[in-house]
Design a protein with these regions (language model features):
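Phosphate- and other anionic-substrate recognition elements at nucleic-acid/protein interfaces
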Residues: 1-101
Length: 101
């Protein structure tokens, strides 16, 4: 399982992670608490992570870059076309990952 891209939806208390492999097959779908973020991404091999640009995204982008990941901040209007159905954290993380930044 080689994750090439991760979409990360950040919220106040929980974060939704969606990762795909080189064949665009979902290989990671997980919800993390704020306290688990650093430990989880520290164990993960360096990869490309997309975040929706918002107030807290710059903090998390800096932290993830320190851990060796490549982070891309995406404006919300670039992600909206990739949302296939209703709105929740899981769907948003999948849409961020699907934006193919």
């Amino acid at each position: 399982m080689t994750i090439i891209r991760i979409g990360l939806d950040i919220a106040k208390h929980v974060f939704q992670v969606h990762g795909v492999d080189e064949n665009e097959v979902t290989v990671l779908r997980r919800q993390l608490r704020r306290s688990e973020m650093k430990k989880f991404f520290n164990k993960l091999a360096p990869t490309r992570i997309g975040l929706e640009a918002c107030g807290a995204s710059h903090y998390w982008a800096r932290l993830l870059r320190v851990l060796g990941h490549e982070v891309v901040l995406l404006p919300p209007q670039y992600i909206k076309p990739y949302v296939k159905r209703g709105k929740n954290h899981t769907i948003d993380a999948e849409a961020i990952c699907g934006a193919r930044y």
